[in-house]
Amino acid sequence: VIGGAKCNINEHRSIVLLYSSRLFGHTLINKEWVL
């Protein structure tokens, strides 16, 4: 995680922001996890 900040585990559970480029890919594992 680049530029992340700590927060309570129950805060913002559904917010995900992805910056995509041709060098990286993202996979949605389930409704709570992005790899």
Swiss-Prot record:
Tissue localization of expression is: Expressed by the venom gland.
Activity sensitivity to pH: Optimum pH is 7.9.
Domain Peptidase S1 positions: 1-35
Q: Which molecular-function annotations from GO does this UniProt entry contain?
A: serine-type peptidase activity; toxin activity
Keyword Iron included in the entry's annotation: no
Q: Which UniProt key words apply to this protein?
A: Blood coagulation cascade activating toxin, Hemostasis impairing toxin, Hydrolase, Platelet aggregation activating toxin, Protease, Secreted, Serine protease, Toxin
Q: What is its main location?
A: secreted
Describe activity control. Inhibited by diisopropylfluorophosphate (DFP).
Q: Is Glycoprotein given among the entry's keywords?
A: no
As for subcellular location, the record says: Secreted
Entry GO terms, CC: extracellular region
> What is the annotated temperature dependence of this protein's activity?
Optimum temperature is 45 degrees Celsius.
The EC number(s) attached to this protein equal 3.4.21.-
Record GO biological process? proteolysis
Q: What does this protein do?
A: Thrombin-like snake venom serine protease, that cleaves both alpha-chain (FGA) and beta-chain (FGB) of fibrinogen. Partially degrades factor X (F10), and release bradykinin from kininogen (KNG). Potently induces platelet aggregation. Shows a proteolytic activity towards protein constituents of the platelets cytoskeleton. Hydrolyzes actin, actin-binding protein, and P235. Shows a preferential cleavage at Arg-|-Xaa bonds.
What the record says about family reads:
Belongs to the peptidase S1 family. Snake venom subfamily.
Q: Describe, as the record does, how this protein assembles with itself and its partners.
A: Monomer.
**This protein is called what?**
Thrombin-like enzyme cerastobin
